Amino acid sequence: MPNSQAKKGLFQFYPHNLIWLGLSVLAIVLDQWTKWIASTHLNYADPVPVLPFLNWTLLHNYGAAFSFLSDAGGWQRYFFTSLAGLVSILFVFWLLRMPKKMVVLPVAIALILGGALGNLIDRITLGYVVDFIHVYYQNHHFPAFNIADSAITLGTILLLIDTFFLEKQRPKNSDA
């Protein structure tokens, strides 16, 4: 029997995949809610100790992940906004067309999508990304991050697991 997914048009999707978009929305809501709490209850760059290795520290990130390119001339805001928007559109199409039997890959894509959109909302509305989770050990500090960054990181780890360990086990013609 031919692969039913191959017969789908570009804009057709499997309705069961709406649950993965729900996971993306959950990541966005959790990210934006925690950023709002951090922005309204923390003073900028003033660490609040939580655990011996964790502070809440409100920071504004004008660059990419972990403040990469934050001191560039301002072009990075438009570049990362455009990149996140384009990748998000592609991920939505990819996500909606996943076969039903796949789980790890759509969870990975949904988390990356939710994280990218969470940070995109900040870039568009604020001109920077709100970071507030500050992890450290003694004098070794990891760059501040947020829930969106965590979703992207977890999604990327799951994507790598799927690519290197699970993809080989999938049947070639996975029907929806």
UniProtKB/Swiss-Prot annotation:
Biochemical pathway: Protein modification; lipoprotein biosynthesis (signal peptide cleavage)
GO biological process, one term: proteolysis
Topology term for the membrane: Multi-pass membrane protein
Keywords, sorted A to Z: Aspartyl protease, Cell inner membrane, Cell membrane, Hydrolase, Membrane, Protease, Transmembrane, Transmembrane helix
Catalytic activity reported: Release of signal peptides from bacterial membrane prolipoproteins. Hydrolyzes -Xaa-Yaa-Zaa-|-(S,diacylglyceryl)Cys-, in which Xaa is hydrophobic (preferably Leu), and Yaa (Ala or Ser) and Zaa (Gly or Ala) have small, neutral side chains
Active site: 131, 149
UniProt GO MF annotations: aspartic-type endopeptidase activity
Family membership: Belongs to the peptidase A8 family.
PANTHER family: LIPOPROTEIN SIGNAL PEPTIDASE
Name of the protein this chain belongs to: Lipoprotein signal peptidase
